[in-house]
Amino acid sequence: SKLRRDNPGLISCTITGYGDTGDAAQKKAYDFLVQAEAGICAVTGTPDAPARVGVSLSDLATGLTVFSAILRALLQRGKTGQGVDLKISMFDVMADWMNMPLLAHRYMGGAPDRMGLKHSFIAPYGAFRCANGALILISVQNNREFTALCEQVLQQPQLPTDPRFSENTARYANRIALEAIVNAVFEGFSSAEMVQKLHPPKHPRCILTECLIIS
């Protein structure tokens, strides 16, 4: 308070694990613990087991949130001359990142299932193994992308008019049959050949990259 009196434009920021009041304020707030308690682990992993995100998500996200909040405070001070005391908890940051699962739980009958590299609402989506054992990921988001995939990659232009696959809701409901079709094609080509087939930018795809390649 003395610093504030001496400098009304002061901007301060306090980072906590679970806030600064109540019993939770005394809890340890390691990244893994915050991920788990905020629900991140419950929607991450495979149907068999939850998992933590493979990087320190809570730490990184909190840092980004603090950065954004301080920038906003600087803009506000530039207009008003007044500073602000910011209080940001790691748990609140992660709870905010749970926006989609929480909305699904409230309005769509339940939180999304853990799906590994697959998606709980979209198909075809996920990793498909090629003839040489390598995995290629595709992420088809709409009917236009699905039609392009069927015509140019799968060489089955009739699929988009098949009632089982004509819309995303139908594709997801029949995803086992659809994934079998996609798998049958991918298994007939090496990953290099499939990358070439998927080369046009209209095809949402990537390879599953290991740390060795990135480094």
Predicted regions located by residue number:
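Aromatic-enriched alpha-helical interface/lid elements that frame and gate functional surfaces
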Residues: 124-205
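Short, solvent-exposed polar/charged micro-motifs at secondary-structure junctions
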Residues: 96-100, 170-178, 215
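Active-site-adjacent "lid/gating" segments in soluble enzymes
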Residues: 2-140, 148
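Alpha-helix boundary recognition
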Residues: 4-5, 187, 199, 215
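Structural signal for conserved beta-strand scaffold positions within catalytic alpha/beta enzyme cores
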Residues: 14, 42, 90, 161, ...
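Alpha-helix/helix-capping structural signal
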Residues: 93, 144, 209-213
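Conserved PLP-binding catalytic core of the aspartate aminotransferase-like
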Residues: 180, 206-215
